[in-house]
A protein has these predicted regions:
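Beta1/beta-strand and adjacent pyrophosphate-binding region of the FAD-binding site
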Residues: 1-13
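Glycine-rich FAD pyrophosphate-binding loop
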Residues: 6, 22-42
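Conserved Rossmann-like nucleotide-cofactor binding loop
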Residues: 13, 36, 153
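Conserved N-terminal glycine-rich FAD pyrophosphate-binding loop of Rossmann-like flavoproteins
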Residues: 34-57
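A conserved beta-strand/loop capping segment in the N-terminal third of enzymes
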Residues: 51-104
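Predominantly flavin-linked oxidoreductase catalytic cores and closely associated redox partners
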Residues: 108-247
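Flavin (FAD/FMN) cofactor-binding core of flavoprotein oxidoreductases
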Residues: 249-261
Length: 261
């Protein structure tokens, strides 16, 4: 079958593309290399811009935990900022665990008429320098347009010439979920004075993103510009940050094993 659009990648970008195209009456197929229900490691925070994009697609986000602003902490200083009220975006964000968020968008894509296929790793088919479709499990599926929504580090992106600049600054992060009685708070919290177990400042930040379901997404991220970055142990850094927020958040033990990206 010839499709109008083939989408590689079932994250928010890919599923949003499939939703829009299917609603416009186009024949759309989306390929997700993971199974249905796969999780994507993330901080789970949605900005007002993201909520605005969901509104444009008429996506119901009422199940997500509403976030009204940001609490920033640097040393002993603390400041709370509300999301601004503008004509461009709503004045609130949300926390929506990626497993639930991504699955919801894929469900909407299917309901909109897109052909969504799981456990299907697709690669672009190139003929005479033109992408004419995708190959999945040895099968060639042709499409008038192929949309790559896998990120720049995937095999498909590299086939199309995406190359990472080795001198470009990058970051690493790790997160876990933990129970807290403060899970229903409506501010994201970011600690800008992150330190390792030796007390050395780390260029990055720690976060507490309340999920509204009894848990908080706790995580830390660091930039490659820091001295000794290659020796940085993210699990140790997360534990160090957790020791600081454990008392004020009445934080319980991690529900799952911390995962990095």
């Amino acid at each position: 079958m010839q499709f109008d659009i083939a989408v590689i990648g079932g994250g928010p970008g890919g599923s949003s593309t499939a939703i829009s195209a299917a609603r416009a009456g186009l024949r759309v197929v989306l390929f997700e290399k993971g199974p249905y229900g796969r999780d994507k490691v993330c901080g789970d925070g949605l900005t007002p811009r993201a909520i605005g994009a969901l509104n444009e697609l008429n996506i119901d986000h009422s199940v997500a935990h509403r976030i009204d602003g940001l609490r920033m902490i640097a040393g002993k200083k603390k400041r709370e900022l509300s999301w601004p009220t503008t004509d461009r975006f709503p004045n609130h964000g949300a926390v929506w665990p990626r497993q639930k968020f991504d699955n919801h968008l894929l469900d909407v894509a299917i309901e909109s008429g897109a052909d969504v296929r799981f456990n299907a790793e697709a690669l672009p088919v190139i003929e005479d320098g033109v992408v004419v479709g995708v190959e999945v499990n040895g099968e060639v599926i042709r499409a008038s347009l192929v949309v790559l929504a896998t990120g720049a580090q995937g095999a498909a992106a590299k086939m199309l010439g995406a190359v990472r600049d080795p001198d470009e600054t990058f970051g690493l992060a790790i997160r876990a979920y933990a129970p807290t009685p403060r899970h229903a708070e409506r501010h994201l919290e970011a600690c800008l004075s992150l330190r390792d177990e030796h007390g050395t400042p780390v260029p990055g930040y720690g976060w507490m993103f309340p999920a509204g379901d009894g848990t908080v997404n706790i995580g830390v991220g660091a930039l490659s510009t820091m001295k000794g970055f290659k020796k940085l142990n993210l699990n140790t850094l997360l534990d160090q940050y957790a020791s600081i927020v454990r008392e004020p958040w009445s934080l319980g033990d991690y529900i799952d094993k911390p995962r990095a990206w």
